[in-house]
């Protein structure tokens, strides 16, 4: 199934935007792992709406664990959690019942499912499905942290404004935990304020903006992953593209490598405390599909939120006539902001899956 992921742990997300709940099933977690539910809630709060620069829709997003967790520890059985959808307004989508929203999955989903799919809030294509992903990511991060592996992300670009990038060789440098407690997820607060200003301007204009999320993973040894189709990049990318709105991904120097010479792009090896490292990290922590022991650094690009208030051209699928559409509902003027913990969660689940297969 397309909603399943993983080789050593099996992750399944389920539900729809305006269904009674969304949820996650995780199979293969080691037994006896301590899981702090309050830390999970801290993670979930980073994704919540209700802020000036996000959707007004705000859910509590408190997971209900149905099985797999007992006395604060994993039992070794499949772990299942659901998150109730309480703040829903299907009436916002009545005028779009037969009119596909531009750049949403409405039309191809209509063709695939013959119109039987739930289109309220995007149904199974909604960003609401990232809530259960964040539950899985929060659990994965706690397990990884005990192995000395840490994951963090920030909004590196939005509306043409750039944040300070991670140091590719030492991305943590004391900022990982700070990022996870910030209301707006940038390293540079001044850049964050400029981004917020631009996002609010777009919102006021009934428009939206895109952005880029940068993610880093530290503490991984060399040799994880597989060559060719099982590469570490492939596995991370597959998971990241499961987040709605992602348009591209790059590792290390990424597409700028195309403009470099080999002498500039190559990362010379060195010894640090008798451990093989590289002087630079243009490869982003992965070479030949295998982790190199350097931090994994990647960036995911998000398109502007397609749900905008401006009139847009579309087609009535019942009458097969062109029409104009004005989208109602509650939407993010920049989905990249709330996607930061989602990217982090996706990376954490993927890395845990690789680590457990070592």
Name each model-derived stretch:
Residues 1-358:
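Generic N-terminal targeting/processing segments that precede catalytic cores or assembly contacts
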